[in-house]
Amino acid sequence: MEPLELSIYKRYRNLMDPTWKSGLEVVPRHVRLEEIVDDYDAFCFDGYGTLYNRGDFVYPGAREWFGLLRSRGKHVRLVTNAASNTEAALAADAAARGFDFTAEETVSSGSLAAEFFADAAARGCPVKEVFYIGRPTGVNLLHSFGVEASENPRLPVVAVSSATADDEMYARAVSLLQKPNATLLVLNSDAWAPRIDGTRAPVSGELAERLRLDSGCKDVLYFGKPFSGIFDKLKASLPVDARILMIGDTLGTDVMGARYAGIGSALVIGRNEPTAELAEDELALGVVPDYYLDV
């Protein structure tokens, strides 16, 4: 991992559990999905970097994984930190790539912000506007909460769903976050993400961390993996006794979050977790998956 990336995921770990000591007791083994398909009832996939990437790119073997699970009647879920649209739209995007998740089978980090806005309204301090950094489609998500994107929100609330800020927008966000009682909403907590060509790039979680550091903002709320809210929503969508496996490409979100949630995890190596850095990163974060999933 990049140094800042590792520090971000360590921060996440410490926010979840300052006494984190477990996570290395498992000895992961390399498996193919068909070897463990009978060991779990529900299979939860990360989206970008695990099943697909930008445009119509689909990773080799991903459709075969999905088809196998559908043919066996397994529960499937898309559990994604993509926060630039509603769950219905994210499900439709996945279906267009060959993964026919329904909206009910989709659990996204952005949807969890609904609780923040509801709580603010219940306290008599409704948030109707935010300074928004993200893709244009993200306004659809905000609208589903009854919230507008504004250059000059009445309250100093900044929401980040993707790393799309230019220098002027970044400076404006820092200025807002330096105001009293400012809040930073990190709708997508991914720090780095893989590209189709095999390289990796900083994304929304990295941008949000720089905003936090540069502004000194103390009230920072994180949505999505690895935090418990998204896994609580996932579990609530499944039978109580379901045996659950989280499949993803990121050690610091998919695997660490699954471990904290008490469910199984399988890591796809070499996309968002460089193979050569895997052992060092596992030791640094104090977590390993149950499996390394081979294609």
Give short role names for the model-derived ranges:
Residues M1-G47, N53-D56, P60-K74, A83-E104, ...:
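Asp-based, Mg2+/Mn2+-dependent phosphohydrolase catalytic module
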